[in-house]
From Swiss-Prot:
GO cellular component: nucleus
Organism: Arabidopsis thaliana (Mouse-ear cress)
Upper lineage: Eukaryota, Viridiplantae, Streptophyta, Embryophyta, Tracheophyta
Keyword set includes Membrane: no
The protein's name: TSL-kinase interacting protein 1
Chain positions covered by the region annotation Disordered: 486-523, 626-679
Length: 743
């Protein structure tokens, strides 16, 4: 009593303003000298505070000292103040109650702390401090990191529930059973209110940790009440008014017995629930959606005794993964245009309110162009046309995520759809929010995809002419007279029978003539940046005396240096060309006489091929001649040689006769070192193979050296060329005689 009276005097001293001498004055209304003396003593012990009290921030060391003292001495502010020397008693008291308010704000209603129950409150505060130490964070900084804050709150709730279950189990193991008198009083109290046959649950505000007191008759304090919770009905009753201290102690003993009896009933119900948990889960799955339309929780709709404490805690501690999908394509495209991801997956606790999910979506997508109207959630099977036939959840819904999950049938994958909608004038029909941009349907998307596939197939089909590739953009190079097609379709035009080599992407070369398609020989040459003429002209120069080919050199790559080379298999290209032409007749395929191209020049560029063609008939030579009478020296195109190979010497073509006969009319020009375009100075060339009229010409080499089908016999030509180079001395004279005839 003396401590309470001293505390009352302190409060009165703080309320009375200071006098002129700085001493607090206390009005003694009862004119009691003892009261005045005790008040003066309290005033001298605790001087008046300053008008503006500054509550300094608590450092980590001060908080550690506070919780260490709280663990040792409990709720004793004077002893705690002696441990925390940098703070006074008022600051310690303020910190204690401020922490209680903060924890009640963060915890749910089932775990609210009562400051009148210091044992549970102190235990919860110590749990709070241990978790702060675990996460290495101050309480004032928790909200700055939402993820860590969420984990912190969940861990705290789990620990408090665990402590509460442990205390209940401890009391049960001690054998504190409910007396018959206590059960009779509870049953008669319920029977008076017509609640005898209904299951009920007792919730005591100050009954978790009640000290054992001596016997006696009891009555309650003002403010202590016994709440009877019957589903949604709560009744508060107060037993007795006033009385003596011994009656209060007797009531607390009865209250203790009642709590123990309720614990026994709860344990029995838990055991019964575990035996029939499968059946109850099936019943909850079969519940229709109309049961939850009133907004009641599934746990509150059933009786309180049907749900054990452990199962309820398991339900609340579980997690749900919610996948959100847009209600239609308009919403999806609008969010994607605003650089938002229209598909989200959220991890929620079971008791997370569905309205919190809507608030999160509004904060995330509130600036989007489609965020007009009210954001609603629907079941996953809802569509834009049938939204009025389905359930919906708004920001006013107070259901939890677990309840919504039960309403949609508790699927294995929890999915909902969202959309922005407005109500019409009557408020009964929901119409979708109109959007400014047109939204193509799913069929339009399928048509676009199908069109892209058709375009891809067209580019990979047969050989296309210039007219059929209208989407290609052509760039003309006047210096060489070439048309390089580079457009959407960068793949070579091939026939249906062609073998398609792997991983080839070659830019085709077209004729200047728009109506002429690419010939098969040109297509074979376009598969690599090494031309057929270059290949044949460099074979003799690179063969060693032992017949072993050294590594390939750069050669005459300047003719196609502008063509990108991405083919990784030249053997596959040759095989495709042979497969294309092996079944065709050996009739000669004349070239188009309306245009000249790089490939016409390269067909006669090879010096060896041209010299061997001197054996052939003049009609066969004329068939492979380039049109328009372009001047050539040893099969070289004069325009390209003069433009690109100045270091190899210039050529003076002769205009004596037929254009194809101009270059080889003087065979000594070809044999002179330094002037051969392909660098074949070391190769022995005969003086003239034409007039010798050898039998080998007509019987062995005539058919092989005809460039039939525009290089159709490519493989035979290569084999014959190599064979002819090795047997070149069979046709000529002695080496000295040949050198005497050379200029």
């Amino acid at each position: 009593m003396l401590k309470q009276f001293t505390h009352y005097c302190e409060m009165q001293a703080e309320l009375i303003p200071e006098g002129p001498n700085g001493e607090g004055r206390l009005s003694n209304q009862n004119s009691n000298p003892n009261l005045l003396s005790s008040a003066s003593i309290s005033i001298t012990q605790f001087p008046a505070k300053k008008p503006t009290r500054q509550w300094a921030a608590w450092t980590h060391q001060e908080e550690e000292s506070f919780f260490t003292a709280l663990r040792q001495v409990g709720k004793n502010f004077e002893k705690i103040t002696s441990r925390v020397q940098s703070k006074n008693k008022d600051q310690v008291r303020h910190y204690y109650y401020r922490l209680v308010r903060r924890m009640n704000k963060l915890l749910g209603p089932d775990l609210s702390l009562d400051a009148k129950n210091p044992k549970d409150t102190n235990a919860a505060m110590l749990r709070w401090w241990s978790l702060l130490e675990k996460y290495s964070c101050k309480a004032s900084k928790l909200h700055l990191k939402p993820r860590r804050f969420k984990l912190f709150i969940e861990a705290l709730e789990h620990q408090l529930l665990k402590d509460r279950r442990k205390s209940i189990r401890k009391r049960t193991c001690q054998g504190e059973n409910l007396s018959s008198a206590s059960l009779g009083n509870i049953s008669s109290h319920s029977r008076e209110r017509g609640l005898d046959n209904r299951p009920f649950k007792l919730i005591l505000s100050d009954g978790q940790n009640v000290k054992k007191l001596g016997p006696g008759r009891a009555s309650t304090k003002h403010g202590e009440s016994l709440s009877v919770n019957l589903g949604d009905e709560k009744e508060d009753t107060a037993f007795g008014r006033g009385g003596r201290q011994r009656r209060k102690q007797g009531y607390r003993k009865w209250e203790k017995a009642a709590i123990d009896g309720v614990s026994l009933v709860a344990d029995a119900a838990e055991h019964l629930e575990r035996t029939s948990i499968d059946k109850d889960m099936d019943d909850q799955t079969d519940l229709g959606p109309t049961r939850y339309l009133t907004g009641k929780s599934p746990l509150s709709l059933c009786s309180a005794g049907d749900v054990p404490l452990s199962d309820a805690n398991m339900q609340f501690s579980a997690k749900l993964k919610l996948q959100l999908f847009p209600i239609d394509e308009c919403t999806r495209r609008s969010l994607e245009m605003d650089k938002h991801n229209p598909h989200l997956e959220l991890t929620l606790s079971n008791r997370k309110k569905i309205s919190s999910v809507l608030e999160h979506l509004n904060r995330k997508w509130g600036s989007s162009s489609c965020a007009t109207g009210e954001l609603l959630l629907f079941p996953y099977n809802a569509r834009k046309e049938t939204v009025t036939c389905h359930q919906r959840w708004t920001h006013d819904s107070f259901l939890s995520a677990a309840e919504v999950h039960s309403m949609v049938g508790s699927p294995s994958v929890f999915r909902l759809r969202y959309g922005w909608f407005v109500h019409d004038a009557s408020g009964s029909i929901i119409s979708q929010v109109p959007t400014s941009d047109p939204c193509p349907s799913l069929e339009d998307d399928m048509n676009v995809d199908r069109l892209n596939e058709v375009n891809m197939l067209l580019t990979e089909s047969g050989p296309l002419s210039v007219h059929s590739t209208a989407e290609q953009t052509t760039s003309v190079e006047p210096s060489q007279g070439l048309v390089c097609a580079s457009g959407v379709h960068d793949r070579p035009a091939r026939s249906r029978d062609d073998y398609e080599p792997a991983s080839t992407s070659i830019t085709p070369l077209e004729h200047l003539s728009g109506g002429n398609a690419q010939s098969p020989g040109e297509w074979a040459d376009s598969l690599t940046n090494i031309s057929i003429g270059d290949l044949l002209s460099e074979v003799p120069d690179d063969i060693d005396s032992d017949g072993v080919d050294p590594p390939a050199t750069e050669g005459s790559h300047y003719l196609l240096r502008d063509v990108p080379f991405t083919s990784d298999s030249f053997d596959a290209a040759i095989a495709a060309h042979i497969l294309r032409h092996q079944n065709k007749p050996s009739a000669q395929l004349p070239l188009t006489s309306g245009s000249s191209s790089l490939w016409d020049d390269e067909e006669t560029r090879d010096a060896f091929s041209f010299q061997k063609n001197r054996f052939a008939n003049s009609t066969e030579l004329a068939s492979v001649a380039s049109p328009k009478g372009v001047g050539r020296v040893n099969g070289e195109p004069s325009q390209l040689v003069e433009a690109s190979s100045g270091d190899e010497g210039s050529y003076n073509p002769h205009d004596d006769g037929d254009p194809m006969e101009e270059g080889p009319a003087d065979p000594h020009t070809m044999d002179s070192p330094g002037k051969t375009p392909c660098g074949l100075a070391d190769v022995y060339w005969p003086d003239s193979l034409g007039p010798l009229d050898l039998d080998i010409r007509s019987s062995k080499y005539t058919d092989d050296l005809i460039l039939s089908e525009s290089l159709g016999g490519l493989s035979r030509l290569i084999a014959t060329s190599l064979d002819a180079f090795q047997n070149c001395s069979l046709f000529g004279f002695d080496n000295k005689k040949d050198k005497s005839n050379m200029v």
